[in-house]
Amino acid sequence: EASATNEMELFTTLQQLMSQNQPEMPQTAGFAAAAGGAFPELNVGVMDMLTNLQRGDTAALVVDGSSFDPELLSGGQVNVLHQLKQSPVGRAANQMDAMTIDIVAMLFDYIFDDRHIPDSLKALIGRLQIPVLKVAMLDKKFFSKKSHPARRLLDTLAHAALGWAVHADEQDRLQAKVEELVLRILASFEEDLSVFEEAQVQLEAFLKEEERLA
């Protein structure tokens, strides 16, 4: 179908861009050729490990030879997705999974490098690394549709950070609301993307109310 074809073309383009930036990364021609142009089936084992990690269960990732530091994940201040490639998750990942990890890692690199986003909000947004990675693995429309619920939530969070209030009480309210939404996603998200849509609706309503009260 046209939509699936567009998504495959997007992934191929992203792959080429990443290969240009990272010459050592092998070409993964299987993307366009897999299953006659279809995406490979979801790697259930990888998803299970990510869900456990999202919920704070890092035991399966702390093994000999793994450089993954689970303590960094709860802090949200470091891009742990780069380390994830060297963990059991990365070793179990197929080519599509590995590329998805790289692309989502690049997305969070932009967030962490944005000097306009306060560190306290970066730390909260950073805790969404694993849920967002799961979304990207579950639904490739995450990359091709700006209206995707998870992308809209990230965009709204970034815009809220740009409008970070001068007054401490307004900062505290936004911080508390974002933390509430992040914790809810961490606790409840498995495969139902509606949790991101609900969080987006609630955040927009909160921001409109804050604007009304300003």
Language-model regions: role of each:
Residues E1-A214:
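Extended, low-complexity, amphipathic alpha-helical coiled-coil/linker regions that act as scaffolds
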